[in-house]
Amino acid sequence: MTHLKGFDLLALGFMTFALFLGAGNIIFPPSAGMAAGEHVWSAAFGFLLTGVGLPLLTVVALARVGGGIGRLTQPIGRRAGVAFAIAVYLAIGPLFATPRTAVVSFEMGVAPFTGDGGVPLLIYTVAYFSVVLFLVLNPGRLVDRVGKVITPVLLSALLVLGGAAIFAPAGEIGSSSGEYQSAPLVQGFLQGYLTMDTLGALVFGIVIATAIRDRGISDSRLVTRYSMIAGVIAATGLSLVYLALFYLGATSQGIAGDAQNGVQILTAYVQQTFGVSGSLLLAVVITLACLTTAVGLITACGEFFSDLLPVSYKTVVIVFSLFSLLVANQGLTQLISLSVPVLVGLYPLAIVLIALSLFDRLWVSAPRVFVPVMIVALLFGIVDGLGAAKLNGWVPDVFAKLPLADQSLGWLLPVSIALVLAVVCDRLLGKPREAVA
């Protein structure tokens, strides 16, 4: 096959959409929509800029270099690049995100029917990771199995939920609260940033590229083109889901005004609108959303570590699936306390890496720009990580006084200054001298 047919390309886009749509993507927008109230659309637009825009730019950046994070990190050197990639894959994979998909889907989709006991959780997670392992053992079939089978079911459930939210709202749009009253666009922008979907996009790039190549596409330009199209399809789907869920939250103050999170808002809405069957609908949405995300994460880790280490893809995915199963049943709380600071610390590095890569044609010497700017991002990533670990006493007060520091964006101004200085030096120094043989 030299080109993807329209249906195959759509299935690729559906697969990409399903990889990104985790439980958190469904849970958060309703709570943000409820807080935004009459400013719901301004907040939703700000949320889309970062919650959808940043992951889409990441997919584009990865597509331009062939799908692998290793190519993106070349300007900072092999050792630093490999260290960064390992940290991202482990933190977003078996140490945190993958086990969490199983626990969240159990607590939201199954526990209401079975209870929260250890035995139901064990039975569920064994079945859950068995399905995950079945799907990931043959990554070349992901488009067929996820894009053509699982995602249409997920989309159908989302259409029912989203359609009901729009055409059968629980009430009128409520009033805004908190910071959404004065700056809804900015608040939505910041909350979209805090979803950290950019880290997921970094690891999913290789899954998308591999799925395309496994369809017989060998032309690198076509791989890039199809990856970008898949990213656009996924971004469109995510945007529609987010908008519907924002509206659901904004119109649910009458039935869930005291809700503490999106789970309670969604539960209140589906039970009022659909009755007992609403809980089943929500269970299907959450379980399939978590399942497809877990499949993407395990597949990405398998592709990366089998290429990095002298072990087979099959061995990696089996080991990571078993490890995730164990963590989901007994070690999640402790690993979350360790992994969340790592994720927060890696996020500035990931965003800076993507931004510099997208504008790589502007740099005379990429390493002269990448290295100093990434070092500054690393410094402030460590600061944010310490803050997430509740170790603020280790951080000098000056960091807390930076603009947007309370929103985990204290790194933005220093990194911008470092970028300007690096670009000026890059232009002044000119082209690097070529080595003489």
From Swiss-Prot:
GO molecular function list: L-isoleucine transmembrane transporter activity; L-leucine transmembrane transporter activity; L-valine transmembrane transporter activity
Gene Ontology CC terms, in alphabetical order: plasma membrane
Membrane topology: Multi-pass membrane protein
Biological process annotations from GO: branched-chain amino acid transport; isoleucine transport; L-leucine transport; valine transport
Claim: Transit peptide is one of the keywords in the record: no
One Pfam family matching this protein: Branch_AA_trans
Cell compartment(s), UniProt: Cell inner membrane
InterPro entries xref list: Brnchd-chn_aa_trnsp_Livcs
Transmembrane segments: 9-29, 43-63, 80-100, 117-137, 149-169, 192-212, 228-248, 280-300, 308-328, 335-355, 369-389, 404-424
The entry's keywords: Amino-acid transport, Cell inner membrane, Cell membrane, Membrane, Transmembrane, Transmembrane helix, Transport
Chain's role: Component of the LIV-II transport system for branched-chain amino acids. BraB is specific for isoleucine, leucine and valine. The LIV-II transport system is coupled to sodium and lithium ions.
Protein name (record): Branched-chain amino acid transport system 2 carrier protein
Organism: Pseudomonas aeruginosa (strain ATCC 15692 / DSM 22644 / CIP 104116 / JCM 14847 / LMG 12228 / 1C / PRS 101 / PAO1)
Species lineage: Bacteria, Pseudomonadati, Pseudomonadota, Gammaproteobacteria, Pseudomonadales
Name of the coding gene: braB
